[in-house]
Amino acid sequence: MNSINELLLIYGSNITKIKELVLAGANVNYVSPEGLTPLSCAESVEVAQFLLSRGADVNATNEDGKTALFSVSNVDTCRFLIENGARVNHVNNKHETALFYTTDMKKIRLLVEAGCDPLVRSYDGKRHYDLLAHNQKVSFINFLANRKKKMETVNAPLALAF
């Protein structure tokens, strides 16, 4: 890595260095040959906020069709991206959502509560739900079961009206 754009990728949490590089002309929407963008490497809300303020596209995709939401692991940063228009049901070239790329229950809860569909099937027929069930993520199964019960309770009066 030696270009100014590539340097943006290695300073994911260093806001001072990120600002210096952007002010020196680094492209906030740069996509590396590996499919990384400055926003996908942002490790803090502060860095993501700065990049968006300088024109970074919250829904920019790499050649695999992945957005920053697929790779950002910090839950607060993910929340910030969602609050700023990141599409939670965006699918990549394999028809996978960001859910397919996390096993962190905090990020899973955030994505599902923001409307990401855990039952979306990838082109090879897999669902995030199935992958976690296979890996014995009981907390995820319980979370979805409780969410379904809440939805049924909320929708019960509507169902009775028909």
Segments (PLM) and residue ranges:
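Ankyrin repeat structural motif
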Residues: N14-V22, V45-S53, V75-E83, M105-E113, ...
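N-terminal segments that cap or nucleate solenoid repeat domains
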Residues: M1-E34
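Ankyrin-repeat helix-start
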Residues: S3-E6, P38-L39, A68-L69, A98-L99, ...
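Ankyrin-repeat-protein effector appendages
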Residues: M1-L8, A114-F162
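Ankyrin repeat A-helix N-terminal signature
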Residues: L9-S13, C41-V45, S71-V75, Y101-M105, ...
